[in-house]
Amino acid sequence: PRNYCFHFTCMGTVKHHYAMIGTAHLEDGYPLYYDAVNEKGLGMAGLNFVGNAHYQKEEEGKENVAVFELIPWILGQCGSVEEAKKLFMRMNLTDTRFRGNLPAAQLHWMISDRNQSVTIESVQEGIRIHENPVGVLTNNPPFEEQMFQLNNYMHLSPKEPTNHFSDKLKLQAYCLGMGALGMPGDLSSQSRFIRAAFVKMNSVSGDSEEESVSQFFHILGSVDQQRGCCETKDGTFETTIYTSCCNMSRGVYYYTTYENHQITAVDLYRENLNGRCLACFPLIREEMIRRQN
């Protein structure tokens, strides 16, 4: 809510700010956001950027903001991507820990409003702002590399392919979907970026909110991580813990979890936006099955 106090490491206490809604890990009563959208319709999400993220020590004359504070710092005072870009020009992103046993997460971020998206990366050279024309971001590699790889897939099409192989051969498509032959199907973040970009930019949604929300989850379903298919070095499995989107005009936040495919909605405006206490809702993690008989 607007009057929840954010105690920033170097920037003091902010008692009044834009209200926001999102998914967070609550640590000692403080929301460590994975993603969020504010009441002005500005959204932000952080994704893994291990090995490439680089943060600075505190610097005099800059607005020093710790990584774990970044989402509320931006969404608390910015109503658009353009406002956020100006704020980043004054900012120094630090590696200050929330607590001793919680190291700074290595992330890069996508920030979006109704009109545009940008990717923010803090690297050795400093903070970099990239225009994001596809409105998609995954984990590593750096965003410029992700975008460059799209050049290798400019032949992909939702349409039925025609024969460019040779006019001496009578070649023809023998099933639907062959226009997308060659689209990577593996679970690497680079391949998921390509797949998500293609599906997002070619998908067709109905006009209603329900149809748009449904289509969003179908789009993200194309890059779902299934348990058992991506094993980490310590023997655990990478999975899609949750998937979310938000109607930026109405402040309705929708999500599913790995365990529950039913879409759950949380409405920002059904809470007291002028309150001082967090409104917390646990993620639903058991499958909700609608039985018809």
Regions found by a protein language model. Name each.
Residues M44-G46, I129, Y253-Y255:
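Short hydrophobic/aromatic-rich beta-strand segments that constitute the beta-sheet cores
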